[in-house]
Each structure stands twice: as C-alpha cells, then as structure tokens.
Amino acid sequence: MKLWTGLFVSLIATGALVAPAMAQNAAKPAIVYSTGGKFDKSFNEGVSQGAQRFNKETGIAIAEFEPSNETQFEQAHRRFAQRGQDPIVAVGFSQAVALEKVAKEFPNVNFTIIDMVVPLPNVQSVTFKEHEGSFLVGVLAALASKSGKIGFVGGMDIPLIRRFQCGFEQGIKYANPKAELIANMTGTTPAAWNDPGRGAELAKGQFDRGVDVVYAAAGSTGIGVLQAAKDRGKLAIGVDSNQNHLHPGTMLTSMIKRVDLAAYNSFKAANDKSWKGGIAALGLKEGGVDWALDKDNEKLVTPEMKAKVDAAKADIISGKITVHDYMSNNACK
C-alpha cells in the first residue's frame, strides 16, 4: 500500500553497528510520529532526539513513520506490531484511540504513548506536568514584560493546551498580579497544530493590543508565532524542545518537555529487559519539565530574573507552591 512505501527505509541507524546489535536479541523499537513532521522543531523533533541518543549508544536501528494525517495511526501501529517491532512509541495524545485498539490486538507487544494515558498492561503512558513548567516561564514573562500585557497562542483548543495556558497565567500573576494575559487558540481541529501562518496572524494581533511577550504552545503553528515576534521586535517563549536557537535575541526562553527522555527511557528499558507498563507523570521534581537558559537567551535574563524563577521552581518542587492543573477540573481555579 502507498502508506508503507519507504516506511522501513526511514530508520535512525548508524550503519555497520546495526546488524550485530539486532542479532543479540535486542529491542526492535519503532516510532509513530504525530502529524506535523519529524522535524517540527518542537514535539516530534524532541522524540527524534531521544531516539538518536539511544541509537548512538546502542547501534540499534529505530523504525520510524511520519503520518500525513491521523487516519494513518492505527495501520502504522498494526504494521509495526506485525513486523515484530517492540516497543512502539506513539507521539501525542491524538494516537490514543488507535494505539488502544492495536495494543489489545497485540497483548505481547509493548507500546509507549507520550502525552496521554491508555490503561492497558502492555502500554506505558508518559504524561507531563506542563502546568509546572508553564508557571516558570510565566514568572519570567511577567518579569520581562514592560507593557504588563502578555500573550498566549495555543494550538488545538483542548484541555491539555488549556493546562499550559492556566499554568502560564498563574506564573504571570505570581510575579505581577496586575499583568494581563491575552490568549488565543488556533482552532478546534488537528490542523491547528500545523498552521504557522495563522500562528503569526494571532501573534501580530496580540502585539497590536500591546503584548510584548508571547508564549506559543501550538506545535508547528508556534513557529509562526516565534517568527512574528522576531519580526516585530517582541519576546517569545518556545515549547517542548529548546527553541531558543531559532531566533537568538527575541527568544526569552522555552518551556522544555523532556519528550526525548520519554522515548529514550522506553527504548533503553526494553533493551535492558526492564520495560514496564503503567503511568508516569513527569514534572519539575522528576526532571520532566523545565525552562531553558543558554547562550541564545542569557542576555535577556538578568541574574535577578533567574533568581526569582529558580526560587519559584524550588518552591514548586518542595510543595510550598501548588500549581493548579486545569485538567483536574477543566477550570483554571
């Protein structure tokens, strides 16, 4: 079928090392990416980085599939399972229904899903406490803003993205109770993750209303938000992967989700014969989320700003600060 043309040509591999590693009854990992492409400079690319790390350390090839739309998820998982790939990593919450169906058909194959819970014994569900990481970048945004107006551009309007927004708003209000958040969602369908042009339009509309710092949690759509900030001389906050390098000088920071670690840990555990199903929720304490400070944004973050963000981080980890999770009650309160 056309869907599978070149599927197994797409491998993360290191050439000569692959055959010996595979001959030793090693793991045969695979990845089904989310829509938007492997090199989306965000979520998918973070998973790819984790896979590359595993491949570099072990020499084991990783089969990959980049779907063009969500209807391909189920067949991708089924074909990988039929070919003996294990574990199979599903990138993104939108694969949950397809993965659950296929995982029931193949109870002896292990699956890992990132960003959603599928309660089956052969599924490892890795979620993140995005509200905690978003709180930190909210603190930084409030400290960096001169206008007191801060923007948020989300992708698809779903509870998960509301979780980002809610955590961000709490961080803003923690640092500056008088600050105003102006928020927009890109859309209500999966297309909202892959529309940089619309992201740029929304960001520009916010800038016209006085926003001088904007946070994008919108997949590939966010690339347009970051570009618009550069074009207008405003500050932007990236998401999932460290996006600071995209526009040094206007990237205030990035809220990092260690999706790379989720993929790497799944592959490594399978290879070590220690893989287990269940649910893992990774927050600041677990090293699953954080904010990025490096050579590309260090000139934008004063020592005083860093100290305040680090103090908030320590207080969240200790329990002194509790960041409300929007998904606990579908409300930001």
Regions found by a protein language model. Give the residues of each.
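Bacterial N-terminal signal peptides that target proteins for export
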Residues: M1-F8
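Sec/Tat signal peptide C-region and signal peptidase I cleavage site
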Residues: L17-A23
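A residue-level marker of the well-folded mature domains of exported/periplasmic proteins
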Residues: A23-K333
